[in-house]
Amino acid sequence: MNLEEENTIFKPLYSLKHSPINAYFSKNSDDFVVRERPLYEFSGKGEHLILHINKKDLTTNEALKILSETSGVKIRDFGYAGLKDKQGSTFQYLSMPKKFESFLSNFSHPKLKILEIFTHENKLRIGHLKGNTFFIRLKKVLPSDALKLEQALMNLDKQGFANYFGYQRFGKFGDNYKEGFEILRGKKMKNVKMKEFLISAFQSELFNRYLSKRVELSHFANDFSEKELIQIYKISKEEAKELKKQEQFFKLLKGEVLGHYPFGKCFLCEDLSAELERFKARDISAMGLLIGAKAYETGEGLALNLENEIFKDALEFKAKMQGSRRFMWGYLEELKWRYDEEKAHFCIEFFLQKGSYATVVLEEILHKNLFE
């Protein structure tokens, strides 16, 4: 794969096989609602205020700027567990120094409300959340499409989903990763935060491409013969047989990096049979590479061969990035839906572990690219 020759936006493969489903989706505050779920209970004591806020059609940074102007707290002194999109209605938690509490007593803003205030010992940091609950309303849904949506949701609930990075990660034109690649190759940029963001977009792009390659492998393992798998992947007959034997959609590979799901340490897949049982029980999941010097390394085998195929253009820049691992396969939790035939509305609710994108799930369900 030559990143320099890429002129089109990469589109990851879907795991489900149905045709596109017709539905209208608008990411507004009535039809897209996100509720953050904290990682821990707030203690009720300490030097930090925890603000439970509801923002509508504001980014997290825009909300912080509004609160900063009201309270006098510098933006860098606020804490948050995750950055949220502008579109939609978001319920999330922010932290700020308690000594500024009095400045919030008369706070009022049409797009930002403070719902509750707690106290806690520490400032909120990125990742200090379990995940997010999402509400999505689809409109103009015909009864025939509602049936397709129900089937797609049941399939995803049963098998899980490919945990791609969402389009939000890649900028307005979907090509932030190219800027990140240029920075790694020596292009200067003074803005350190922007530089880090663009490099992370590059890492995310490669992650998505590798995960898409694994989704393709899983489809091929289901649809092709052992002989064809041997020819395509240059693997042994035993390896091809092992792939065909796996009943679940996403196929695990010996030597790849696994992790305890949803939080836990990385380890190599050595005993494939044993790990398959844990994978089916949703105790572990496969972990894709966010390339960098400190990322847990893949063992010998097909997983490493596929990794090298995707990451070959980036290997010389590995030392310039810290690197880590990210779950490739995730699961919908607390899933429910309802269809109002009279209004032609189809409403979906589910919980995702932190770092997963509801828009990725929606694209998988609809088989449509929301970016376009």
Swiss-Prot record:
Residues 160-330 form the TRUD domain. Keywords: Isomerase, tRNA processing. One of its GO terms (molecular function) is RNA binding. One of its GO terms (cellular component) is cytosol. One of its GO terms (biological process) is tRNA pseudouridine synthesis. It holds the Pfam family TruD. The keyword Chloroplast does not apply. The active site is at D85. Its EC number is 5.4.99.27. It catalyses: uridine(13) in tRNA = pseudouridine(13) in tRNA. The keyword Isomerase applies. Responsible for synthesis of pseudouridine from uracil-13 in transfer RNAs. Belongs to the pseudouridine synthase TruD family. This is tRNA pseudouridine synthase D. It comes from Campylobacter jejuni subsp. jejuni serotype O:6 (strain 81116 / NCTC 11828). The lineage of its organism: Bacteria, Pseudomonadati, Campylobacterota, Epsilonproteobacteria, Campylobacterales. The gene is truD.
